[in-house]
Amino acid sequence: MAKLDAYFGEYGGQYVPQILVPALDQLEQAFIDAQADPEFRSEFMTLLQEYAGRPTALTLTRNLTKGTKTKLYLKREDLLHGGAHKTNQVLGQALLAKRMGKQEIIAETGAGQHGVATALACALLGLKCRVYMGAKDVERQSPNVFRMKLMGAEVIPVHSGSSTLKDACNEALRDWSATYEDAHYLLGTAAGPHPFPTIVRDFQRMIGEETKNQILAREGRLPDAVIACVGGGSNAIGMFADFIEEESVRLIGVEPAGKGIDTDQHGAPLKHGKTGIFFGMKAPLMQDENGQVEESYSVSAGLDFPSVGPQHAHLNAIGRAEYDNVTDDEALEAFQLIARKEGIIAALESSHALAHAVKMAHDDPEKEQLLVVNLSGRGDKDIFSVHDILKEKGAL
């Protein structure tokens, strides 16, 4: 029986209760079989094109890098049906679940984008859907909560722990432990127990594949760097995957520095965490001196995660990708900047990557460079929270 690698270097693996091992084995084999089946691939690609709206545009910014020699392109995952890159892999996993004969889908969500994507895929494919969401996130993402309910999903607020994404993840896994015979756990990021990091990456890798073709058609060469925000890491690994072998292309992931890396309110485990076991995997993790999981923090709910996908950890360890961080204030500034300069309302998550790219351009205005930012989602979900933050700062 064919098997996928469970580890990326020392990271990854399958640290789960024994009861879940058969379910994960079944999922791995189903994924291997599906990837080898032209009919499955064809149905997936048809849904991406005709339902989700792929390929997404590659947009050259007109004003963000004025006064510099940088050309900055945006990969427009915000234009995808559902409003973010999440729709790509959700359609893939939902098709896989149907192929496995599952009737129900369990999901977790932070910003609500994965929950919305899961709800729309379940509505389309006739699957029952329940979504676990931290109670804090339910409050700060009420438009997405209503969207999910509108599409027939049951939204279950999680009040344990910090009432955020990590707690929703734990509850979703607990549910799956009891229901895996009928239910598929549709994990929302390129993290968690094997084979999820590989499945999610492969169902997101068209982001980088399209970007490569589009930039070659437009510029006749590969970019100097591709830049993406990193929470769990699915939009970033989707962008990076097709460029890993292209050694001339820098892969830059941007973690949330929150209120500052020197505070305890950030979400940057790659640079400031220690290796631990969390969410069924071995990965960098924000921990206190006793090894307890620390609460992460970010202004963007989708980056508020105390760990990171194992492939990012490996790419960081071997020096193939580099990871920096951006504070809440810098992301908020970029959120406003792209709206004013380009007429695009970007997600707060994506605004972290954008802030880093704009800084790269203006730090060295004479340097000729070709940059691509993965604009992973649109910011409609964030306008109310940003309005309140700016009002509080007296910036409105």
UniProtKB/Swiss-Prot annotation:
Q: What is its EC number?
A: 4.2.1.20
Task: Give, as in the UniProt entry, the pathway in which the protein acts.
Answer: Amino-acid biosynthesis; L-tryptophan biosynthesis; L-tryptophan from chorismate: step 5/5
| GO CC term, one of those recorded | cytoplasm
What is the reaction catalyzed? (1S,2R)-1-C-(indol-3-yl)glycerol 3-phosphate + L-serine = D-glyceraldehyde 3-phosphate + L-tryptophan + H2O
Give the SUPFAM superfamilies listed for this entry.
Tryptophan synthase beta subunit-like PLP-dependent enzymes (SSF53686)
Q: Which cofactor does it need?
A: pyridoxal 5'-phosphate
Protein's UniProt keywords contain S-adenosyl-L-methionine: no
EC class: lyase
Q: Which GO terms describe its molecular function?
A: tryptophan synthase activity
Q: Which InterPro entries match?
A: Trp_synth_b_CS, Trp_synth_beta, Trp_synth_beta/beta-like, TrpB-like_PALP, TrpB-like_PALP_sf
Its domain of life reads: Bacteria
Does the record carry Ribosomal protein as a key word?
Answer: no
Which keywords label this protein? Amino-acid biosynthesis, Aromatic amino acid biosynthesis, Lyase, Pyridoxal phosphate, Tryptophan biosynthesis
Q: Which residues carry this modification: N6-(pyridoxal phosphate)lysine?
A: 86
State one Pfam family annotation: PALP
Q: Sorted alphabetically, which PROSITE patterns does this protein's record hold?
A: TRP_SYNTHASE_BETA (PS00168)
Q: Which residues form a coiled coil?
A: none
Q: Quote the function comment for this protein.
A: The beta subunit is responsible for the synthesis of L-tryptophan from indole and L-serine.
Q: Which family does it belong to?
A: Belongs to the TrpB family.
**PANTHER family, sorted:** TRYPTOPHAN SYNTHASE, TRYPTOPHAN SYNTHASE-RELATED
Self-association and partners: Tetramer of two alpha and two beta chains.
This chain's protein is named: Tryptophan synthase beta chain
| Species in which this protein is naturally found | Vibrio atlanticus (strain LGP32) (Vibrio splendidus (strain Mel32))
Q: Which gene encodes it?
A: trpB
